[in-house]
């Protein structure tokens, strides 16, 4: 059975056998569809609701 995931930052679908998984020290698993999403969340600490290219932006606006 193939499991599909959603990106933890932008909310986009991640096709099977792609994407990156990040495990925090507390055991939380974060899935990212691209290096861009990973950097924006972990390195730059951006809010996904303020970026136009994320799905959470369209839900808020």
Curated annotation (Swiss-Prot):
Keywords: Metal-binding, Ribonucleoprotein, Ribosomal protein, RNA-binding, rRNA-binding, Zinc, Zinc-finger. Its cofactor is Zn(2+). Binds 1 zinc ion per subunit. The keyword Cell inner membrane does not apply. One of its GO terms (cellular component) is ribosome. Zn(2+) binds at residues 7, 10, 33, 37. It holds the Pfam family Ribosomal_L24e. A zinc finger (C4-type) spans 7-37. SUPFAM superfamilies: Glucocorticoid receptor-like (DNA-binding domain). Binds to the 23S rRNA. This is Large ribosomal subunit protein eL24. It comes from Metallosphaera sedula (strain ATCC 51363 / DSM 5348 / JCM 9185 / NBRC 15509 / TH2).
């Amino acid at each position: 059975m193939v499991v599909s995931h959603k990106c933890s930052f932008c909310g986009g679908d991640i096709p099977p056998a792609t994407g990156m998984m990040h495990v925090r020290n507390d055991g939380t698993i974060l899935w990212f569809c691209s290096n861009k999403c990973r950097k924006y969340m972990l390195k730059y600490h951006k809010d996904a609701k303020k970026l136009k290219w994320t799905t959470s932006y369209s839900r808020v606006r």
